[in-house]
Amino acid sequence: MNVVDARLEAQMQENHDDAGQLFDPTAAHPDSVAVCRFIEHRLAFAREPVCRTDLSGGVLYRECLARLARGQRDVLRPVAFLPGLVSMGLMRWFDQLVVSRTIDSLRADAQAVYGCNVSASSATEDAQWQAIFDRLHVEPALAQRLVLEITETTPLDPLSGRAFVHRARQTGCRIAIDDFGAGHSAHNHFVVGRPDIVKLDRSMLAMIRNNAVGRYQVRRLVALTHENAGHVVVEGVETELDRQMSIDAGVRWAQGDHFSRRSDAA
């Protein structure tokens, strides 16, 4: 362990009960080099399956959810470190690292199909993205097993964002619009054109629960989305009731704790 890693490790131990201090977005002089080193050593994935709502079997893919290992059993979730990365201007670097590590995982398992997030602000091609796309271009069978999920945190740039998506598709990757129905996802859907996958935000389930008008609106949205996307997924399915409501709304694929528990039990 070098000096930088040792210092950051010591800081992590000191702030064990308040990990937010390590990636504090309000810090006056954040040590971005040390933070990058730490993330490179601690990045791990929780893989959440996208399953058929009717339980007929099959997994569309597994989303690689970023975690930072902290000790033997504890992990940091994105809410604890992403704001700090954004404030330090490291979001694109982090997304590129996540995609690269996901590609490594696909190479290690020839049967796996994985997805990972790319924030809309990161979806602008640069030298590092070019290197990643070149890597995928020479392994088209691997690229076909990768889903890039465009998140809704910011609007996707109409020019550079569309060029990024086009370049990714040229390699064979599939494109998903994440959290559709929230934030800037509708705009990002327009920029992407016809996405391979649209993932409905978990708020859609709340609309279904609330009243008949909400149920009608979600069914209509699902029907329209099916016309412009290969697959529609609803996120945040946590209970059997959520699964049944998803089926009633016409959604064939779902993701959430309800399916993760079933997958773990299997």
Predicted regions and their residues:
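Charged helix-capping and loop-helix junction motifs
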Residues: 130-134, 162-163, 212-219
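Hydrophobic positions in alpha-helices of CheY-like receiver
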Residues: 136, 164, 168, 221-225
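Structural preference for long, well-ordered alpha-helical segments in enzyme cores
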Residues: 85, 98-102, 132, 221, ...
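Catalytic core of bacterial c-di-GMP phosphodiesterases, primarily the EAL and HD-GYP domains
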Residues: 90-160, 236
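A short, well-structured catalytic beta-strand-centered motif of the EAL phosphodiesterase domain
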Residues: 44-82
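EAL-family c-di-GMP phosphodiesterase catalytic domain
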Residues: 1-29, 33, 38, 42-48, ...
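Helix C-cap/helix->beta junction micro-motif
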Residues: 139-142, 171, 227-228
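N-terminal sensory regulatory modules of PAS/LOV and PAS-like folds
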Residues: 78-81, 98, 259
